[in-house]
Amino acid sequence: MTRNPVVAGMFYPAEYHELLEMIEYCYLNPRGPRELPSKRGKYTKPLGIVSPHAGYIYSGPVAAHGYKKISENISGEITAIILGPNHTGLGSGIATMKGTWKTPFGDMEIDNEFADRLWKECDILDMDENSHLREHSIEVQLPFLKHLEDLNIAKFKFVPISMMMQDYESCIDVGYVIAKVARELNRKIVIIASTDFSHYEPQEQASKKDAVVIKDILELNDEEIFTDVVTHTISMCGYGPVIAMVKAMKDLGARTSYLLYYSTSGDVTKDYSEVVGYASLLIK
């Protein structure tokens, strides 16, 4: 199947040159890394990032921090496993798919072999295109990857995993199988957990709540991520993808983590009465 973008022209520009200008703006912005990716790194081990998925004007500079780090630690052919929450309610509880996704920068091919192995080895994961047709949380990550590809930093395929079902056991199962398949196929991988943090709360309250779960991520404590999201009623839409990513990264040997940047929508709108939190984190 070929999937067409559904939020191009809304969350990010639909036209090539306008999108390139926006991506460069995200990197050079004061809330971004303040420099463009300029050279490929050397891939030595899997990387995991937490990346936001709001409109680029709000969260793009925060996301750019993670992609800058990816650019410094990859080379050659990379499979990007992208986990995102299912906001639409369409399709299966947890699902991948095979085929191609279109972007304004060109097509992104799915690593069909990896997706097929996930489906065969994970009982709770379906092969379901409907889960992905209208969902934006994975789509908004792709232009950043295609931009790195256009800079000749790496060549990407990807695997989309949409998660409507985010109970702890399911997230752990997904993370376990991602790591297992990556080892068995000997893939060079990055794992991207797409999430925003607190939604529509006052700045002070949102930042305090988000600090709790960010601490859990930095400690690679997947169980505490789930517990604190529930206990502190943190309106983080993609905690399941984050838990699955952390589990997979730990199984693949990750031991270190970094908070690259935290910001809120209030830093753009200057309205701090109801903000959305965005964070970029690196695990390796």
Curated annotation (Swiss-Prot):
Transmembrane segments: none annotated. InterPro entries: MEMO1_fam (IPR002737). Belongs to the MEMO1 family. This is MEMO1 family protein MMP1387. It comes from Methanococcus maripaludis (strain DSM 14266 / JCM 13030 / NBRC 101832 / S2 / LL).
